[in-house]
Amino acid sequence: MADTDAAPAAPAPSTPKKAAKKKASKPKTPASHPKYSDMIASALESLKEKKGSSRQAILKYVKANFTVGDNANVHIKQALKRGVTSGQLRHVKGSGASGSFLLAEKTKTPKKAAAKKATPKKKPAAKKTKKPAAKKATKKPAKKPAAKKKVAKPAAKKAAKPVAKKATPKKKVVKKAAKGKGKKK
């Protein structure tokens, strides 16, 4: 039993040592290149393709102009997907990280125009607050006639139901007459 007690005690001290080593190694590796999103943006600007640049062309440009590791392809794929979802890039063809990409600069200018329009929208907002009060006044009288209509509607429904019942026996009578004619022949 002494052996089993010693065995669990040994792994416990070894795990904190490993955690301490990992924490020390993280600050030692500074990036020797800009963000992948920035590198992709510079690649798209310099390639200047009308229909957009492919991931492979972007990868070639990044490897030629920046010092990146062997896993740059994976990082570029992820950065392209993030750029499309954030709106920084526009996906021209394909899906995911395949296809052609362009910088989405056109979407930035409407945002500025929308910000300018936001201040005039405040004035109509005050007018809109007055309009709902008028709408509420119109809704209240509308509810009262609606209640009267509900009283009238059940009477109409009762009248409609017997009419429907009368219509169905007539159809059956017609069918019986047709059957009778067939039997006589």
Swiss-Prot record:
GO biological process: chromosome condensation; negative regulation of DNA recombination; nucleosome assembly
Coiled coil: none
CDD domains to which the protein is assigned, alphabetical: H15
Disulfides per UniProt: none
Keyword Cell inner membrane among record annotations: no
Top-level taxon: Eukaryota
GO molecular function annotation: double-stranded DNA binding; nucleosomal DNA binding; structural constituent of chromatin
Record's keyword annotation contains Nuclease: no
Protein location: Nucleus; Chromosome
Location of the region described as Disordered in the Swiss-Prot/TrEMBL record: 1-37, 90-185
Gene3D superfamilies: Winged helix-like DNA-binding domain superfamily/Winged helix DNA-binding domain (1.10.10.10)
Residues annotated as signal peptide: none
A Pfam short name: Linker_histone
Database matches in InterPro entries: H1/H5, Histone_H1/H5_H15, WH-like_DNA-bd_sf, WH_DNA-bd_sf
Residue stretches making up the H15 domain: 32-105
UniProt keyword terms in alphabetical order: Chromosome, DNA-binding, Nucleus
Biased composition annotated in UniProt, kind: Basic residues: 109-185
GO cellular component, one term: nucleus
PANTHER family per the UniProt record, alphabetical: HISTONE 24-RELATED (PTHR11467:SF36), HISTONE H1 (PTHR11467)
Function as written in the Swiss-Prot or TrEMBL entry: Histones H1 are necessary for the condensation of nucleosome chains into higher-order structures.
Family as reported in the entry's similarity comment: Belongs to the histone H1/H5 family.
Protein name: Histone H1-delta
Species per Swiss-Prot/TrEMBL record: Strongylocentrotus purpuratus
Lineage: Eukaryota, Metazoa, Echinodermata, Eleutherozoa, Echinozoa
